[in-house]
Amino acid sequence: MRGLHLTADLRGCAAARPVMTTPAVLRSTCLAAVAAAGLSAVGELFHRFTPGAPQGADAPTGITGVVLLAESHLAVHTWPEIEAATLDVYVCNLGADNSTRAEALLSALIGAFEPASVERHAIERGSERAAIAR
């Protein structure tokens, strides 16, 4: 069950960008990035949150989107009200090393949001050393 788990916290994303507030745009952006990275989408769900207090009924609202991959998953969360988004990419490396594909997917999505700043993290999952320690 070896794999690579990548996360990115994006700040300074323009709230007016459709990728921040329009589920169909975020969905097509994610699916195109998945395909371009050479990964396989097997399912997806994108949800736009309902406007409400304290921002008001016309305020832009965020989206949570998940793409199930044959190799694991992609999750995206947007907060246009604070110009932020988070990305989470996890790929299994059981039959093949998908690390390069995961990096390509994360980089493509970061580019789509055009953030002012990015905080990235990488976690190696299921190392042999961890398995031996059990």
Give residue ranges: language-model regions.
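Polybasic/polar functional segments that serve as interface/processing modules
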Residues: 1-134
